[in-house]
Amino acid sequence: MADTTTAATGERRPERLELRVPTSPTQLPAVRAMAGDLAMRMDFDLDAVEDLRLAVDEACATLAAVGQGDEPLTVVFEATREGLRIDAWVPTAAGVDVPRDGFGWAVLHTLVDTVEAGPSNQATVPGGNGSTAPVACIALVKRLRRYSASELLAGQPDADVSVAR
């Protein structure tokens, strides 16, 4: 098992998992399943697990619709003490943006605590190749319920979370 603490401080560092899948509708359920599995291992309640599955499914479908050709969808999951951050992106043609209107966008805002989307490039996205090639990305954050806003602002969460069991 890998050590997930930093040597200098002894604090837990975020655990990160990266998936690259074709944007085919037959492959997107694998990403949804990974989101659900990670959320369960992090002790999210069952409603939050299902919310994450649905949010990831909607984000991936949205990105698949704006992706360029046969380029893969990249999804980076980062488990922290406070919750789960999911960054998903797909290469696009220059000038392509993520649609932020309609029912799908409203669903994303309802299911997670934070959602951001927009154009970027390979140099700035997690798991990117460092180039300036354009991508469309969606970032989702779902916090564990045990962390109140005051605890998050104070920076003093009360427990570590690991995705390993």
Outline where the language-model segments fall.
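Helix-loop-beta hinge of the Bergerat
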Residues: 11-44
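Conserved ATP-binding N-box helix of the HATPase_c
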Residues: 45-70
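Conserved beta-strand-loop-beta-strand hairpin that lines the nucleotide-binding pocket
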Residues: 1-18, 62-165
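Ordered, soluble secondary-structure elements with a strong preference for glycine-centered loop motifs
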Residues: 25, 46, 50, 97-102
